[in-house]
Amino acid sequence: MSDRKPVRGRHQARKRAVALLFEAEVRGISAAEVVDTRAALAEAKPDIARLHPYTAAVARGVSEHAAHIDDLITAHLRGWTLDRLPAVDRAILRVSVWELLHAADVPEPVVVDEAVQLAKELSTDDSPGFVNGVLGQVMLVTPQLRAAAQAVRGGA
């Protein structure tokens, strides 16, 4: 068994999810395929750490809901198109919008703060403010989207 452990903490898990989404886009495959490849590699080579479960959940979730997530981001871009954004910003926004819609255990302000921090660490000087603005607009509609999804699932 390997002495290497998966990355601890959600910040690092989110950062890794952003990297996986970036890799998937560059390779022209889904993030879920990247997760599957990484899981198989970690299984075959014990010295390679497994992905953090949250990283895998986010990447798979973004893959599963990609069209809806991209539509929601696009609807809140002003003066930009999704394909014109830096690839890292796209990945950060996709992870964050997935969390806003599907990670009920993560408070919305935490999602936005984490996204801004990732933009500071990984992207351009203008990206943190841009990411904050887009997510601020998306947050205005997420309660209605979550309620509609719950109603479709037949929940209360």
From Swiss-Prot:
Keywords: RNA-binding, Transcription, Transcription antitermination, Transcription regulation. It comes from Mycobacterium tuberculosis (strain ATCC 25618 / H37Rv). The keyword Cytoplasm does not apply. This is Transcription antitermination protein NusB. Homodimer. PANTHER family: ANTITERMINATION NUSB DOMAIN-CONTAINING PROTEIN, N UTILIZATION SUBSTANCE PROTEIN B-RELATED. Belongs to the NusB family. Involved in transcription antitermination. Required for transcription of ribosomal RNA (rRNA) genes. Binds specifically to the boxA antiterminator sequence of the ribosomal RNA (rrn) operons. GO terms for biological process: DNA-templated transcription termination; transcription antitermination.
